[in-house]
Amino acid sequence: MTVRATGLPETVHIIPLGHEIDRAVKPLMNKKVDRVHLLAISPEADIDPVMREKQVNYTRKVTDHLESVSIPVQFHPVEMFDVLDVLKNVSRIIVQEKTDGNNVYVNMSACGRKTSFAVTVAAMYHEVVSYYVAADGYATGENSGKEIDHGMSIVESGNIELLQQFQIMKPKDINVELLAELYRRKMNNTPYMKSDEIINFLHERKVHGFEIKPEEKRGLDKSKHRRALLNRISRSHLEELEGQKYIEKKKIGKEFSV
């Protein structure tokens, strides 16, 4: 964790937003909040124009409410109906804020159900607090006219429930870096890494045991050293990722790729 120059960590809230106002705003009233990251669909999103304008209106109202009490808002356009896009963006913000040494809270109750699931998983994976804002009523039936001011949920009491933190099994840090590299390659249409590429990857990151590359050896020592590194890759890196179903290892003769 990076120590901030000011000495004290900031308090940051991440709020993925659906058709809600109260559930996004009420928990932060009279609280010390240094910044809010507000995630919602883009104003240019390719969806039904009526639904798009409705969401833009909610986003504007929540932003105005928060800024009126001097809470800065950073807006992030996200494909809210895409679980992976939500996971990616929430995780990116969490990692950046934690790296800066800040305290991060994630509101998982101001968005739709699928989005809420993704948000909660991201918060628990990165070990930050997620919370649920209880509704005292809903803008339906005879209360439907209240939606314009409250959103779909009406919050009066402001009861907040901190979700229990469940530990999510995750790979070692270097293996997460390896997964990230595989993902980058996939996005660039080279969705695999050969064994020598993995050796170079671990060597560049100064991973223990990979300080010396095979080509730095001579004769039989070169071949012996390379086999030892390949065995180390399998034991220390690929077995874990295969066991957790992150990768599939393909053997090609004496070589392999993932």
Q: What do these predicted ranges mean?
A:
Residues 1-103, 117-258:
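Long, low-complexity, Lys/Arg-enriched
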Residues 103-109:
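Short glycine-rich phosphate-binding loop at a beta-alpha junction
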